[in-house]
Amino acid sequence: MRVINPYLTFPGNCEEAFNFYKSVFGGEFTYVGRFSEMPQQEGKTLSDADKNKIMHISLPISKETILMGSDEWEYRANYGNNIGLSITTDSKEDADRVYQELSGGGVASMPMSQTFWGDYFGMCTDRFNVNWMVSYNENWISQMNGSDQKVESQSMAV
């Protein structure tokens, strides 16, 4: 089974927006991560203002759908490119296949690789200029199949 979830990118007000969505849809955040929690990347420095911004946030709005988002960091979100689709596959092989097909004729912005947050993950923009985040997480699959584990696939912004 594949699952597609909306991913929203904000110009610094993600936390405010998601608190609003939480008031509308109810529920609790299953993940809130800030840029200050990322491993430091060589040649990249976070400003004090960026450290507290949202790297990733997740709000389940139904049994099947998780509203996800982040603040912009390395690119500027504009209306139109501030929404991406996050697809979680049920195997690493399917993640590779989906990523290859979606990025064909488009832009492979982050190749598929194992991430520090646990997902096998990549980002691309397809030939129709749609932003995609492709991931596979074995623990997330167990959760979807009824396991007691409370681990969620986490995606980062495009």
Predicted regions and their residues:
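Vicinal oxygen chelate
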Residues: 2, 30, 55-58, 69-71, ...
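Core segments of cupin and vicinal oxygen chelate
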Residues: 8-63
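Extended amphipathic alpha-helical segments enriched in small hydrophobics
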Residues: 65-67
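Acidic/polar active-site rim loop that often engages polyanionic ligands
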Residues: 81
